[in-house]
Amino acid sequence: MLTLIPVSLAQANEFVRQHHRHHKPVAGHKFSIGCAENGRLCAVAIVGRPVSRYLDDGFTLEVNRLCSDGTKNACSILYAAAARAARAMGYRKIITYTLDTESGASLRAAGWTNAGLAGGKAWTCLLY
Protein backbone atom coordinates (compact mmCIF):
# COMPACT_ATOMS: atom_id res chain seq x y z
CA MET A 1 0.00 0.00 0.00
CA LEU A 2 1.28 3.47 -0.89
CA THR A 3 1.29 6.17 1.79
CA LEU A 4 2.45 9.77 1.93
CA ILE A 5 5.25 10.53 4.37
CA PRO A 6 7.11 13.71 5.32
CA VAL A 7 10.71 13.94 4.12
CA SER A 8 13.40 16.54 4.66
CA LEU A 9 15.12 18.27 1.77
CA ALA A 10 18.26 16.26 2.57
CA GLN A 11 16.33 12.97 2.32
CA ALA A 12 14.58 14.04 -0.89
CA ASN A 13 17.82 15.22 -2.48
CA GLU A 14 19.56 11.96 -1.61
CA PHE A 15 16.73 10.03 -3.29
CA VAL A 16 17.04 12.29 -6.36
CA ARG A 17 20.82 11.76 -6.37
CA GLN A 18 20.30 7.99 -6.45
CA HIS A 19 17.32 7.68 -8.80
CA HIS A 20 16.69 10.69 -11.07
CA ARG A 21 17.44 10.10 -14.75
CA HIS A 22 18.57 13.58 -15.76
CA HIS A 23 18.50 16.09 -12.88
CA LYS A 24 20.64 16.75 -9.84
CA PRO A 25 19.45 17.66 -6.32
CA VAL A 26 18.09 21.16 -5.68
CA ALA A 27 19.45 23.93 -3.44
CA GLY A 28 16.21 24.79 -1.64
CA HIS A 29 12.50 24.09 -1.34
CA LYS A 30 9.25 25.17 0.26
CA PHE A 31 8.39 21.56 1.14
CA SER A 32 9.07 17.97 0.13
CA ILE A 33 6.78 14.94 0.26
CA GLY A 34 7.66 11.28 0.14
CA CYS A 35 5.69 8.25 -0.96
CA ALA A 36 6.35 4.95 0.78
CA GLU A 37 5.38 1.41 -0.12
CA ASN A 38 5.20 -0.81 2.95
CA GLY A 39 7.45 1.63 4.83
CA ARG A 40 10.09 1.89 2.07
CA LEU A 41 10.61 5.29 0.41
CA CYS A 42 9.78 4.81 -3.28
CA ALA A 43 9.30 8.38 -4.59
CA VAL A 44 9.77 12.03 -3.63
CA ALA A 45 8.44 15.41 -4.74
CA ILE A 46 10.42 18.58 -4.08
CA VAL A 47 8.31 21.74 -4.35
CA GLY A 48 9.73 25.25 -4.38
CA ARG A 49 9.60 28.66 -5.97
CA PRO A 50 9.32 28.74 -9.75
CA VAL A 51 12.66 28.68 -11.54
CA SER A 52 11.37 31.31 -13.98
CA ARG A 53 11.49 34.73 -12.35
CA TYR A 54 8.49 35.74 -14.49
CA LEU A 55 6.35 33.14 -12.75
CA ASP A 56 7.68 33.88 -9.25
CA ASP A 57 4.76 36.07 -8.15
CA GLY A 58 4.45 34.84 -4.56
CA PHE A 59 1.35 32.80 -5.38
CA THR A 60 2.88 30.13 -7.63
CA LEU A 61 4.91 27.06 -6.72
CA GLU A 62 6.75 24.60 -8.94
CA VAL A 63 7.35 20.88 -8.54
CA ASN A 64 11.09 21.24 -9.10
CA ARG A 65 11.82 17.51 -8.84
CA LEU A 66 9.66 14.42 -8.83
CA CYS A 67 11.54 11.16 -8.70
CA SER A 68 10.42 7.55 -8.38
CA ASP A 69 12.07 4.16 -8.31
CA GLY A 70 9.37 3.00 -10.72
CA THR A 71 6.72 2.07 -8.18
CA LYS A 72 3.33 2.13 -9.91
CA ASN A 73 1.09 5.14 -9.10
CA ALA A 74 3.67 6.82 -6.83
CA CYS A 75 4.17 9.81 -9.15
CA SER A 76 0.47 10.59 -9.54
CA ILE A 77 -0.04 10.32 -5.77
CA LEU A 78 2.77 12.83 -5.21
CA TYR A 79 1.62 15.26 -7.92
CA ALA A 80 -1.89 15.29 -6.40
CA ALA A 81 -0.54 15.69 -2.86
CA ALA A 82 1.76 18.55 -3.89
CA ALA A 83 -1.17 20.39 -5.49
CA ARG A 84 -3.36 19.88 -2.40
CA ALA A 85 -0.59 21.07 -0.07
CA ALA A 86 0.11 24.16 -2.18
CA ARG A 87 -3.58 25.11 -2.21
CA ALA A 88 -3.82 24.55 1.56
CA MET A 89 -0.88 26.93 2.03
CA GLY A 90 -2.66 29.65 0.04
CA TYR A 91 -0.87 29.32 -3.29
CA ARG A 92 -3.06 29.89 -6.34
CA LYS A 93 -1.10 27.89 -8.88
CA ILE A 94 1.37 25.03 -8.99
CA ILE A 95 3.34 24.14 -12.12
CA THR A 96 5.87 21.63 -13.33
CA TYR A 97 7.68 20.80 -16.54
CA THR A 98 8.04 17.49 -18.31
CA LEU A 99 10.06 16.38 -21.29
CA ASP A 100 8.13 16.01 -24.55
CA THR A 101 9.31 12.40 -24.60
CA GLU A 102 7.40 11.66 -21.37
CA SER A 103 3.73 10.73 -21.60
CA GLY A 104 2.44 12.88 -18.73
CA ALA A 105 0.08 10.08 -17.64
CA SER A 106 0.87 10.56 -13.95
CA LEU A 107 0.11 14.28 -14.22
CA ARG A 108 -3.20 13.71 -16.01
CA ALA A 109 -4.14 11.07 -13.43
CA ALA A 110 -3.51 13.66 -10.70
CA GLY A 111 -5.76 16.25 -12.39
CA TRP A 112 -3.07 18.45 -13.97
CA THR A 113 -3.54 20.05 -17.38
CA ASN A 114 -1.11 20.82 -20.19
CA ALA A 115 -0.41 24.56 -20.45
CA GLY A 116 1.67 24.22 -23.63
CA LEU A 117 5.28 24.19 -24.72
CA ALA A 118 7.86 25.94 -22.59
CA GLY A 119 10.35 28.38 -24.09
CA GLY A 120 13.00 25.76 -24.84
CA LYS A 121 10.50 23.70 -26.86
CA ALA A 122 11.84 20.41 -25.45
CA TRP A 123 9.82 20.87 -22.27
CA THR A 124 6.09 21.13 -21.69
CA CYS A 125 4.59 23.20 -18.87
CA LEU A 126 1.74 21.69 -16.89
CA LEU A 127 -0.38 23.24 -14.18
CA TYR A 128 -2.93 22.27 -11.59
Regions found by a protein language model. Give the residues of each.
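Conserved beta-hairpin
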Residues: 16, 29-45
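Acyl-donor binding region in acyl/amide transferases
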Residues: 6, 30, 48-127
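Short amphipathic alpha-helix that is part of the acyltransferase structural core
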Residues: 1-27
